[in-house]
Amino acid sequence: LKEGDHQLEGSLETTVAEINDSGGQATAVAANISEEDDCMRVIEEAKAAFGSVDILINNAALNYYIPVVDYPTSRWARAFAVNVHGPFILSKAVLPDMIERRSGAIVNISSGAAIGPGRGPYEDSQVRGGVMYGASKAALERFTQGLAQEVYQHGITVACFSPSQVVPTPGTVFHKLVSGLDDPRGEPPELMAKAALLLASEPLDQVSGRVTYSQQILKEFGWIDEATGTGVERTGSGYSQI
């Protein structure tokens, strides 16, 4: 919640202050998304502060870079609980109000890790330890399209997107995916925010069930002029092709 509570830079308090200072309204709830009771508390506190939930962004994720042969079962289960079960629980919690209003949007954040290596033989067989994260994000993409079909009749959008390029954050810097927060190879966080807004606000029939990539979808709808990265220069996951 506070700066210094975690080894990574940043805090919920800082984020809330930045939103409020820029003219928005925000409140922070420290919660463990792998726990159902905590998920329900997040929704109840959001409703108490702002009313019924119109848009749910499932952005929380957990990753450990460990080869399967060495992966502790407890960590595997915890990561899936955050990456897959959390979005299910939160979506289930907000759906009754959305169904009653016949409107709403659920946007899930996936990752290029959902793109598998394909079948062998493998010229590059270096162990990177990304099996769990990729599997959980692939599950989230399948969950997205299945839920989109279920709630389509109620006028609710469900969509999913990944960053087209690695977004510099304290976490991606820590894992050496980018060299720093100002790494020019990275994707500005603002593009992720715009893509989430696009999927939550464009007409249902144009976006629901989409599994896409930030710059791909922004360029498709004319929100940006130039695009690069996954979904543009490189083929996305299987679910993004259907």
Mark where each language-model region is:
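A short, exposed helix-loop element centered on a Lys and neighboring polar residues
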Residues: 91-92, 145
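Catalytic loop of short-chain dehydrogenase/reductase
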Residues: 107-153, 165-166
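C-terminal helical subdomain
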Residues: 153, 160-161, 179-242
